[in-house]
Amino acid sequence: MAQRQQLIECPPARVWDVLADGGTYAQWVVGTKEILHADNDWPAVGAGLRFRVGLGPLTFEDTCVVRICEPGSRLELEAKAEPFGTARIAFTLLPWADHTLVILDEHPLRGLGARIQGPPTELVLHLRNRHMLANLARTATKEAP
């Protein structure tokens, strides 16, 4: 299980605003090239995002669905990442003085990713998630009033 955390220098409400805006995900989610559609009720439980992911010229269209939403503090997604299967991606926001401690927990649930889970997979997820949290921090603080 790949768990990382980052202190973001803005209040939890600002970080939540970024998580709650499906249109921003291409700005900070590593590998996401473009958001194709965000359900109007995002991030309500059951709402989805359709997006294009890829590396270089190789791209795929994938989706994610909200599984748990506690506005302002917790968002859990199930992301489909073909051909690898699905993954659980959980964000927890904790107030930390005037800032936000974001805990990101990601692990494969189904498919090839779940079957090959081990140290190499964990390393890739840790590197990806470190970069993703840094992007989230930049997005949240850049847009802060």
Protein language model regions, located:
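Glycine-rich portal/gate segments that line the openings of hydrophobic small-molecule binding cavities
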Residues: 36-81, 96, 134-145
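Hydrophobic ligand-binding cavity/cleft-lining segments
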Residues: 1-41, 145
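A generic structural motif
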Residues: 30, 71-72, 84, 99
